[in-house]
A protein has these predicted regions:
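C-terminal and inter-domain tail/linker signature
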Residues: 1-133
Length: 133
């Protein structure tokens, strides 16, 4: 497709879907066969479950997009969030909750539609949270 479309898809997801809770936009950019690696589910309903679950766990979450990089068939969004999660994403060995707040979202696209989504968290941030006293 185009770099512009790839950028638009990522910007819509981060800024509109997560940032403004506009979940109704998901079918506009998600292919029916899209694989969400976080849930193992496919299609727009998979991303809807992922996004709504994230936002419900962090009421009033604020999203800040650091940067978006794109090619014709991929987009990479570096972003962070602020808020107070209801449930942590895990616990360290000493019982500290783990809340990685800096994320890299990786989208693979085909014909301008999202077909594969993976998210990666900041390892340094996780390590600091796990080792905190």
């Amino acid at each position: 497709m185009s770099i512009e479309r790839s950028t638009e898809v990522m910007a819509t997801y981060l800024g509109e879907v997560l940032g403004k809770r506009r979940f109704e936009l998901i079918p506009d950019f998600v292919d029916e066969e899209m694989l969400d690696h976080a849930t193992g589910m496919r299609g727009p309903s998979a991303l809807h479950a992922h996004a709504t679950g994230f936002c419900e766990n962090i009421p009033g979450v604020e999203i800040k997009v650091e940067d978006i990089f794109a090619t014709d068939d991929a987009a990479f969004g570096i972003w962070n969030w602020k808020g107070d999660p209801i449930q942590s994403m895990g616990s360290s060995a000493n019982g500290n909750p783990v809340f990685p707040q800096r994320v890299l979202s990786v989208f693979r696209l085909r014909n301008g539609m999202l077909i594969d989504y993976e998210a990666f968290v900041d390892a340094g941030q996780v390590r600091a949270q796990i080792s905190a006293p």
